Every structure is written in C-alpha cells, then in structure tokens.
Amino acid sequence: MIPRPPSDDRANQNGDGSKKTGAKKTGAKKAAAAKKTAGKKATPAAKATAAKGAVTKKTGKGKATAKKAVADKAAAKATVPQQAVPKQAVSKRAVSKKAVPRKAVVKAALDIPEAPVSPAVAPDDRDRLLSGTHHAPHSVLGAHPVPGGVAFRVLRPYALSVTVVTDDLRTELHDDGAGFFTGLLPLRAVPDYRLHVAYEGTVHETEDAYRFLPALGELDLHLINEGRHEELWTALGAEPMTHQGVPGTRFTVWAPNARGVRLAGTFNFWDATAFPLRSLGSSGVWELFVPGVGEGELYKFEITRPDGSKTLRADPVARRTEAPPRTSSIVHASHYAWADEAWMAARGERPVHESPFSVYEVHLPSWRPGLTYRQLAEQLPAYVADLGFTHVELLPVAEHPFGGSWGYQVTGFYAPTARLGTPDDFKYLVDALHRAGVGVLMDWVPAHFPRDDWALAEFDGRPLYEHEDPLRAAHPDWGTLEFDYGRREVRNFLVANAVYWCEEFHIDGLRVDAVASMLYLDYSREEGQWSPNEFGGRENLDAVAFLQEMNATVYRRVPGVVTIAEESTAWEGVTRATHDNGLGFGLKWNMGWMHDSLGYVQHEPVHRRFHHHEMTFSMVYAYSENYVLPISHDEVVHGKGSLVSKMPGDWWQQRATERAYLGFMWAHPGKQLLFMGQEFAQGAEWSETHGPDWWLLDPAYGAEPDHRGMRDLVRDLNTVYRHEPALWERDTDPSGFAWVTGDAVEDNVFAFLRHAADGTPLLAVSNFSPVVRHDYRLGVPDDIPAWHETLNTDGARYGGSDVTNPHPVKPEPQGRHGRPASIRLTLPPLSTLWLRPA
C-alpha cells in the first residue's frame, strides 16, 4: 500500500481509466528539498553507526563493503541534490511507524547503509512497467539471485526511500528515479524480507507483493483454458487468503487481449502504477497477490488495450460491489453460517413437476421500498408463507446499474445488488425464506449485458464476452450485447455463474430470461441484419450447446434445484432431457396460455363466445413441455394495467372475473406464478419506484374488504391446491386431465376433471358469464357417490355474491358429456368452483 495523496479523488475511476494522483512538488519545494540534502557529508560517527547497522552476520570483508557503500553515498549526496519526488499524505490503513518530519526521515536514511547499486532495471522493462504493459513484472521486481548476490528492485512512486529489512540486515536501496529503487546485496539466497518505504511524513512497512509465487494453481488454469472450471468464482476475482504464510488478497482477471493489467483501489489510492499483474502463460489470466489487503477494500482493474489506451474496469467475477451509481468492486469473503439444513436435505425428495409449485413473483427493491435484505427477511417469508405459496421468484438480484431495468441488464453477475445490503445479508434473506418453508427462485439473465464502459463490453479492448461478429453481438431490442456462447471461456463464465447462485446462495431454481432471443439468430432482426449458422439455418447452435451444458451441470451438481425457461416460441424439447437432445430445462413458462387466456377474459362476457377457443387451445399442447402458467411482472406494466383492471365491467365484475380467472388458472395443468400486488387486486399497474399499493389493505380504507377478499381467495387457492394431489401430481401426464365440457360456447362455461396418481378426481367448473346458471348438468364418473364443493370463488368472504352449493351433490343416472352419470350444479356468476369426492 502507498500513503493517501492530498486529494482522494475517485470521481474519474470509470471509463478510460484516467485518474488524479498526488500533487507534485512545486519548484520552490524542489529547491528546498535540494537545499536540505546538498552539502551534507557523513561524519565519522555516522559512518561508524551505519557500518554497525549493516549486515552484522557477514564477514569482515562484507562489513567493509557496506561501510564503503555508505561513505560513497554520503560523498555523492554532498554534491548531487536529492531528486524531488511527488508527495503523498498519510494512509489511514497503512501499517506505519510514527510520522516524523521529512528532515528526520532523511537523517535516519543516512544512518542506514545503502546497498551497492545492482544492474538497473532495463530501459525496456522500465518503460513497460511505467506504461502498464509488462506481462511479467515479477521477473523484474522483487528479489532475484544474480551473480554477486541478490538483486532487489522495487517500484514505489512518490517514495523518498525504500529499505530492505530482514532478521539480519537493514539496507536502503538506491533511488534510480521515476519510483524505482534497486540494490545488490551480497547474499547467497533470497531471504524473507519486508520493505520500509519512507514517504513524506511517514514510514510504511509492508511485504513486497513481487516476492510471491503465483497464488493460482496449474489445475485452475487448465480448467479455465478448457472452459470447464465449474467453480470459477474460486479462481477469478478477488480472493482473501493466506499465501506463503502472509495474509492478503489474490486478484485475478481473464483479459487475453490486454497488453497489460494493473490493480487500482483504495489500498493504493487508485494509482495502479506500482501494482502490475503478471500474465499466467497462455491462459489469458492475470494475477497478483497483494499482501495486507483484506475484506472491504474497493478495487478495479486498469487494462491497457491493444491500441495502448487504458480502461478502468470492474471485476467481472466480483462477489460484492458498491451500490449504484458507484461502480467499484469490493473484496469480499463470506462468513455466513446457514441454518436451513432441514430444507436443503429435503429439497430433492420429489421431482418438482410432481410436486405442488405455486410461485409469488417479487421485485425486492419495490416490494417494501427502502427495506434491506435483512429487513425484508423479517416480513417477506411470513407474508408468503401465510398466503400458502411454495416459492418466491425474485426478479434479477445480480448487480445492475440502472434500477429501471428491474435487474435485467446485469453488470455484476456474481454479486447480489448492493442496494439492499451485502452478499451475506442476501444469504440471510434466503435462509429466512427456507426456514419459513418457502423455496427461492431467481431470475437469471445470460442472454445479454449492457454496454457500460466500466463493465463487460469490449472488456480488454476487443470483443471478449460479446461476439466478434457485429450481427451477432448487438441485441436489437434492448441496445445491449449478446454473449459469445461459442467461446469456451465465456460459456464457462455463465455456466459457473448458474452453479454459483445455487451452491453459494442456496437458490432453489433459476428462471432463465429471454431464452427465445438466445435460440434464434434472426430474433427481432430483419433480412440482412443477421448471419446464419454453419448449416445456413437461423438456430444459434452455440446458444443451444450452452443451455444444454448449463442445465446438465446445474442438475448434476445441485440436486433438487429446477431451471425454468422463459421461452415464447414453439422450440421443441425445451424441457426434454439433454441426453434426448433437449435443452434440459425442468419447466417452461407457458406464454401461449397466458396471452390466450388474458385475451379471453378481457372481452365483454357477451363477446366471449367468439373467443371460447382461447381458453381451451392450451390443452392441445399442454403436455408437450412441463409448463408454468405465468401472470408475471411483464403483464402489469407499460400501459397493460394490473390484472384486475384488465377485466371488463364495474368494480364488482372486475374482481369477480379476476377471482374466477385465478380459480381456473390454479386448476389448469401446470404450475402457477403470480406477480406481487395482484394477490389483493391492486388497481394500478406496477412501478418499480413505489411497488404495491399496500394502503389498499389498510382497515381504515373503505374498500379494504374488497382487496382483503381477493387476498383471502389466493390464500385458500394455495391451501386447497397443496392438499389436493389431483391438482399437481400428474401435471405432466395426459392421464391427469379430462374435459367434461370444453365446448359450452354459448354458456361461457368450462369444466374438466383432474386426477391424482391414485385416481382421485377433482372437478373444476368455471362460469365466465355474469348470470347464475341453475341446475347446470355436467357429466361425471358413476363411481363417485357424492361431490362436495371445496372452493367457490363467489364466496362472501372473498367479496362475492355467495351463490354456493352447500350440500353434497349426488350423481344421477343420466348420461351427459359422454359419461354414464351427471350432477346438477348452481353456477354462480363469474366464478370457478372446485368439487371433490365427498
């Protein structure tokens, strides 16, 4: 570390990497410095003291050599003014001796023998080190055996002097100018040593970063080269560690096109000059172990591009970041102790597609604006558990600079957003949800990344994470860049990232965003704006291979998790196993069902008969994939209105239609997802700036019962759903569903049976007309003695008209809908009924 300059200005640490350094000496100060040193000669007493402080365990010849060196230095200083050096202020974090006046520092320096001058740093090495383009700084800097002893070379801009200190010696190095200090000591081997670096007003004691062997192993480099490092976050980024017995932090970054990489941060006051990284062979990885640097330090990589320009970049594998709009990475090590052992042990007991699975979708920053991860942990788990949802799905948690992107333009793929707290704080939230019996899904965005010039875009001066072909790099819809899935290191970066969230944060599943944009080379592109694959087709074969590898790796390493695809096309085999040439996802969002069903209920009841097929068509393909039925954030923003506001009619009819719709949705084959705020019929569409309108549930609000009734319905839907295996056990098996009537077009009625694995049925009936239908006859199996109404969305407690079937309904031996028996029901207006065997 070096002391802080007079002004610690990090305002320009982004972009091109330019930075402000400590103030230079003025001409007057230079003259004063020269005056202090000019004409001073070592007295005999000083010489004797210096000789005594030299290498005390050497031979008499060695002592004489040290004495002569001190005398020569004193004579030289008598005639040559000392070179002026830019000054720096005292470091808050420096391990420093007591600050002393500059005059005393100079005097103290005269009492320390100066090492004989070693061969100076070669001009080429000197230029490359100062320009930040040296691939092997450790081969020049540090201590190296040479003919005649051990050469010490140190780069410390702004230092007044540098002294090598071991158990046996204390010797000042020669000032070669421009921040270089060198010396040749008559030693047979490189000793354990430290550096005393004198700046104006302080002496700083430190380890020499350039005396350490690489802190990254050959196996790590091999796996990175192969694109197979499944724990990439343990090899790249900032890793606090003890290396060769010394605590510090290893910094590593993949930048194969860089001419040089240096490290800037709070520990060197954003001056990277003295902190060049070394290139580790042909891997493209650069590494530097910095002793004394620990958790909480801010840092970035200063990269010299192929054209010689510089750019200051955040760490792509940073595990913690500053809160936006700041962009620095932060050295981090987790100390969290998990308490969700029971959840983790039971997580993989039953396949997700054969389990109850209802999801509450949440945007954490706006669910309760202003709350941190730990504060959310006090409220969110209890709320979700009370409503009976099995999982929450979090909109992207990974760090993103623009809050208005909702997290879908990620810059920090390995760091939870710092807006709400630290990575360990986020673990605390996940832990709390697990202990409440709620699983945690997370939106994951491997489709694209933003163009911010401090992040991934042209990271080392050339396309690196993005594709080299401009037709494949730029995403036309979002102005972002698409990943180069064909590059093994990029694919590894993403696959390891998926594993990282599941293993390190105990995430139970990943919902992969914008899969369709990854699969098709011509996605949102006109003719001439895209380039075909090697076979002339429009399929992105590299993306297919990446998704298959990601899914296979996650399922192999983290049993019990689920991956979910947001895929809006008819791509075949999205949820088919990779060994059967599928993409390997566990579930897929059923975008077709969502669009069709919402389209149906938005029509006036009198017109719904012309759109009856929109509610039945989904069963034509319901078993082609394993589906989730999503009413997500995308459907309640950008002028689309909230769910209840989509419904026609007056306020009562709107709420009744939403209740009927949710009842139909929860009974339909597939898993359920509902975005926050829709569970209590929020009228306004969602905004990330203020979140749900919780005031609607304030008892002092006159219409509070209407909103509370909707929330009570959602709670009961989840409760009955979880206890009725017929609604989830055969979600992916055609034998688990049968239409009773799917063609009651004039009545706006739909009725179907769901079957559990043991054959136990549940009858679901929806009436999307605003009239009561008495004695409505429906065909049923003849082996059920009676049916009992287990849920009615028109119940009074939900805000309905309370038209019910209060008594068990017995079948009559009158065939209907191709079945030998039938029952007569009273169908409430705009409602859904669930009936089970009494």
From Swiss-Prot:
EC number from the UniProt entry: 2.4.1.18
Lineage of producing organism: Bacteria, Bacillati, Actinomycetota, Actinomycetes, Kitasatosporales
Database matches in SMART domains: Aamy
Basic and acidic residues compositional bias, start-end: 1-11
Protein family (similarity comment): Belongs to the glycosyl hydrolase 13 family. GlgB subfamily.
Active site: 513 (nucleophile), 566 (proton donor)
Stated name of the protein: 1,4-alpha-glucan branching enzyme GlgB 1
Protein's organism: Streptomyces avermitilis (strain ATCC 31267 / DSM 46492 / JCM 5070 / NBRC 14893 / NCIMB 12804 / NRRL 8165 / MA-4680)
UniProt key word Lyase: no
